[in-house]
A protein has these predicted regions:
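N-terminal Rossmann-like NAD(P)+-binding subdomain of aldehyde/semialdehyde dehydrogenases
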Residues: 1-103
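Rossmann-like NAD(P) dinucleotide-binding subdomain of oxidoreductase/dehydrogenase enzymes
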Residues: 96-203
């Protein structure tokens, strides 16, 4: 390690969480009403942009984690694309409404705003496993990546923006688990939390 600076982030706080939750709730009103076809088109566009940024993602994770570049390419960045393709195929097969044998109708609906907390050791793997199914189902989300691997999360936010994810559907807040993580997991206007890591991450 050379201790050379590779990037700069701003650590968020409780106020930032409140702002992001408000934006996500506002965006949910419209995004939750999108069709499956709309969201499939969006996921496929995300796949295109992610493919274009594959090497940039791999380099970012290699630098922030200290991982060999071959691992960053073949295990880290590649898993992000693989998960995305899997969610596209799953959404294509998803039946949003089923009639049960007794005549009742089972309807699958987006749950609301999702708070997503990810660890340092598999950054894009974990980000895609949480962010993409939320988007696929019509939910909005707020991501808090590990403060130790923030660069790849920033790059992924740029990918989602370039792909056309609507404003407020995806929100990124950098910060510690003790502050931002706790604020997310305790927020009354977040309907679901997906958390991977130790309790230090914010539970």
């Amino acid at each position: 390690a050379t201790e050379e600076e590779i990037g700069t982030i701003i650590l968020g706080n409780n106020d930032d969480v409140d702002i992001a939750v408000k934006a996500a709730n506002l965006a949910f009103d419209n995004f939750s009403k999108t069709t499956k076809e709309d969201r499939l088109k969006l996921l496929k566009r995300i796949h295109e942009v992610t493919s274009d940024c594959f090497e940039e993602l791999a380099q970012a994770m290699s630098k922030e984690m200290g991982a060999p570049i071959t691992m960053s390419r073949e295990a880290q960045a590649d898993s992000g694309l693989g998960h995305l393709q899997g969610f596209i195929e799953a959404l294509e097969k998803l039946e949003e409404e089923n009639t049960l044998s007794n005549g009742d109708i089972l309807t699958k609906e987006p749950i609301g705003v999702c708070g997503l907390i990810t660890p340092w050791n598999w950054p894009i793997n974990q980000i895609t496993l949480k962010v993409l199914p939320a988007i696929a189902c019509g939910c909005t989300c707020i991501l808090k990546p590990s403060e130790h691997t923030p660069i790849s999360a920033m790059l992924y936010a740029e990918i989602l923006h370039e792909a056309g994810v609507p404003s407020g559907v995806f929100n990124l807040i950098h910060g510690t688990g003790e502050e931002v993580g706790v604020a997310l997991s305790r927020h009354p206007d977040i309907q679901m939390i997906s958390f991977t890591g130790s309790t230090r991450g914010g539970m």
